[in-house]
Regions:
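Conserved small/polar residues in nucleotide/adenosyl-binding loops
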Residues: 132-139
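Positively charged n-region of N-terminal signal peptides that target proteins for export
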Residues: 1-5
Length: 143
């Protein structure tokens, strides 16, 4: 009886301590509400959809990542931002929301900017995203 009770509690403790892990692909997501884990399940665009990417400095001297989507992905960006007017979208990198800008107008040019309101190392993020971007385009070129 004692052994089965102890075994039961050990199993119960193990089950309670396991956390649900869900990996998100690096990219842009819809913010679906203001609650925890309020992102769409899949990104509407990923880092593989970037055409160009640059690390720049904004007017306040802060690092920002600027980029342009591939020409055939720009309509998706335009529609996603049109759908999100008055709402937020989020850029996720390594399962972390890096920025979640409020959309005021449709962004029709296919350009975007990733700012750094939470103090993340944008230079490191830029290098990692650039590497992913280059690898995606190398694969595409060799097919």
């Amino acid at each position: 009886m004692k052994i089965s009770t102890i075994l039961f509690f050990c199993l119960l403790m193990t089950a309670c301590m396991q956390t649900k892990s869900f990996h998100r692909i690096n990219g842009w997501y819809y913010v679906t509400s203001q609650t925890t884990d309020s992102l769409s399940l899949t990104p509407f665009l990923t880092v593989k959809d970037f055409d160009t990417l640059r690390l720049e400095t904004d007017a306040f001297g802060h690092s920002v990542i600027t980029g342009v989507f591939l020409q055939n992905k720009s309509p998706i960006w335009r529609e996603a931002t049109k759908k999100s007017i008055g709402k937020r979208i989020a850029f996720v990198f390594n399962d972390t929301v890096i920025t979640a800008p409020l959309i005021n107008i449709p962004l029709e040019s296919g350009h975007f900017q990733i700012s750094n309101p939470h103090g993340y190392d944008l230079e490191r993020i830029f290098k990692a995203v650039s590497y992913t971007h280059l690898r995606a385009h190398e694969t595409t070129l060799h097919l």
